[in-house]
Regions:
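N-terminal signal peptide c-region/cleavage motif recognized by signal peptidases
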Residues: 14-18
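Sec-dependent signal peptide recognition
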Residues: 2-10
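Serine/threonine-rich low-complexity intrinsically disordered regions
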Residues: 1-2, 73
Length: 139
């Protein structure tokens, strides 16, 4: 009986979300159905905003794309540059000169939001952050 109650409550919550539609307090938002391409939510999508963690998501996208294409493997390593080591903000706390597995760098970006991990990945994929920024723009 308890399971039925919990399940019914869950369905009610899900159904009320579906009926009401999506909403957000975010200044801008875009939600697209991955299968149909249908825009589910569009809110002020042409408003310029700072990239913030969007560049981290794009970095991960490009890393996963390279993994899918066989250009990288999770056990491959990239060396931590001085530039990555010195980067401020949120960090994975990498040490200059150490070699870090792609798998660990991905975790550092996702869990720590590590700026240093993103720089190491960018440099490993494109040689420099600047080259990587160009690749992201092209992509």
């Amino acid at each position: 009986m308890t399971k039925l109650f919990i399940f019914s409550t869950f369905l009610l919550c899900v159904w009320s979300t579906v009926v009401q539609g999506f909403s957000t307090t975010a200044k801008t938002a875009l939600v697209i159905d991955n299968i149909t391409g249908e825009v589910l939510l569009s809110k002020d999508i042409h408003r310029p905003i700072p990239p913030a963690s969007m560049s981290k998501l794009m970095t991960l996208w490009m890393v996963f794309e390279s993994l899918d294409e066989g250009k990288l493997e999770m056990h491959d390593t990239f060396k931590v540059s001085r530039k990555a080591w010195k980067k401020g903000g949120s960090k994975m706390f990498l040490r200059e000169g150490e070699s870090v597995k792609i798998e660990d760098l991905i975790k550092g970006v996702i869990i720590q939001s590590g700026n240093d991990a993103c720089i190491v990945l960018a440099e490993g994929l494109a040689g420099t952050e600047e080259n990587f920024a160009e690749l992201m723009t092209i992509r």
